[in-house]
Design a protein with these regions (language model features):
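Generic transmembrane alpha-helix signature in multi-pass membrane proteins
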Residues: 63-64, 89-96, 104-109, 115-129, ...
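The feature identifies polytopic integral membrane transport proteins across all domains of life
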Residues: 71-78, 98-111, 127-137, 163-167, ...
């Protein structure tokens, strides 16, 4: 008889390969028929809560204890997030000779914290979900101060950041759902073990729905954006992935922490 852990690992492996295909398909469908999927946008917050609840179900108390005992990866990730990413965004924009508006947008993209997608990908890629959630939380708490300063310094623009709103959103869509998922894992571990194989697909379905909502709402803007801007965003993501992974390795962090740092930097604000 196959154990829940083996079934879960098999489900995760399939989900890793399916994730990009599902996201691309969702984006394409929403782009071609935006009016059909735009109503999904009103449920974005609820979708994010379901996604993060499913991530909480995969965590254990030892996972959190390990992160608490080794804060260096969190520190490294936050430093990279607010030093390497915005600086590299400026360099990429200059190298590609982007317009002033596109340059400001790329720098802003490099100056904001990670999002729910990074937590999901950390789970699918055998990273450290507890570390990913911790990085997202700390970066979000720091960003109301760092993001406006970075925008003013690198782009000469001011950026209004709703600090209280971001923190409350973090509590609603990340901390509470993850905490409830972890609590359920503690008090009903046997029942949770039975649904572990399904959790990757719950996360993928949720992210896919969020992508549909975002693409359908922004379809008109995506049409007017030049291809070179997409190239700049892609390069920025690759830079985040490579720097995150190899700096963590240089710091002699474990493989799961290196993967998590790479994902957290490359999937910023998604």
């Amino acid at each position: 008889m196959t154990s829940p852990r083996t079934e879960g690992e098999r489900g995760e492996k399939i989900a890793v390969y399916a994730f990009p295909l599902v996201i691309i398909a969702c984006a394409a469908v929403a782009f071609m028929s935006p009016s059909t999927f735009e109503p999904v946008g009103q449920y974005t917050k609820q979708l994010l809560m379901v996604i993060m609840f499913s991530m909480g179900l995969t965590l254990t108390i030892p996972d959190l204890s390990l992160v608490a005992k080794r804060p260096m990866p969190i520190f490294l990730g936050v430093i990279c997030q607010f030093v390497i990413m915005p600086t590299s965004a400026l360099l990429v924009a200059k190298a590609l000779e982007l317009s002033d508006a596109a340059t400001v947008g790329l720098i802003l993209l490099g100056s904001v914290p990670g999002g729910t997608a990074s937590n999901v990908m950390a789970f699918l890629a055998k990273g450290d979900v507890a570390l990913s959630v911790a990085m997202t939380s700390v970066s979000t708490l720091v960003s109301p101060i760092m993001t406006p300063l970075l925008m003013l310094w690198l782009a000469g623009e001011t950026a209004d950041v709703d600090g209280k709103g971001m923190m409350w959103s973090l509590v609603q869509t990340v901390l509470i759902p993850v905490g409830l998922g972890l609590l359920l894992r503690v008090i009903a571990s046997k029942a949770v073990d039975k649904v572990l194989p399904v959790l990757p697909w719950v996360a993928i379905a949720g992210i896919g729905a969020v992508v549909m909502a975002v693409v359908s709402k922004s379809q008109d803007k995506l049409v007017t954006v030049g291809r070179i801007v997409f190239v700049g965003v892609a390069i920025q993501n690759v830079i985040g992935f490579l720097f995150g992974y190899y700096l963590a390795k240089l710091a002699r962090e474990r493989e799961s922490a290196a993967r998590t740092t790479a994902i957290e930097l490359s999937l910023i604000h998604i």
